[in-house]
Curated annotation (Swiss-Prot):
It comes from the Bacteria. It comes from Parafrankia sp. (strain EAN1pec). This is Imidazoleglycerol-phosphate dehydratase. GO terms for cellular component: cytoplasm. PROSITE patterns: IGP_DEHYDRATASE_1, IGP_DEHYDRATASE_2. It catalyses: D-erythro-1-(imidazol-4-yl)glycerol 3-phosphate = 3-(imidazol-4-yl)-2-oxopropyl phosphate + H2O. Belongs to the imidazoleglycerol-phosphate dehydratase family. Pathway: Amino-acid biosynthesis; L-histidine biosynthesis; L-histidine from 5-phospho-alpha-D-ribose 1-diphosphate: step 6/9. Keywords: Amino-acid biosynthesis, Cytoplasm, Histidine biosynthesis, Lyase. It is found in: Cytoplasm.
Amino acid sequence: MARTARVERKTKESHVLIELDLDGTGLASAETGVPFFDHMMEQLGKHGGFDLTVRTEGDLHIDAHHTVEDTAIAFGTALREALGDKAGIRRFGDATVPLDEALVQSAVDLSGRPYCVHVEPELVGLIGTYDTTLTRHIFESITASARIALHVRVLSGRNAHHVVEAQFKSVARAMRDAVALDARVAGVPSTKGVL
């Protein structure tokens, strides 16, 4: 069965289209009007091993918040839909990823229970047109709409670009492990029988 999803989200603030294939090859393309955020979404696809297409038109004349938030919500929804009943998945994943001086640890549980723990040094500023304070909100939005538990911990880093990018790469690698199919898992990996 194909583990894919196509999610379209329309509000008065944005129009988002996400296409996701969990069993892809890491082909990723993002066009949101926020170049650094495009780069981050492409990191999720590439390092998650997902085929991912992101197309967002948002009210950038105000700022990037709605565009970024709605894209994250739609991505989380696509992740949840592509996982289906979660039969045969590994469920858990973790990764520690360096990017020069930055080091980030992420862990994910595809539990069906949304919970986000995000620990980073206070980063207030812009990377291009990307507001660094949105990073936590992106992961909170993905977590809520995907219904997953996600921990992201920045262990070190000074350069804002490196700190944010290492977070996306680390989350992607953790998700890659969690969504992977495991031939030893019969059914859903939970003693409850459902995730």
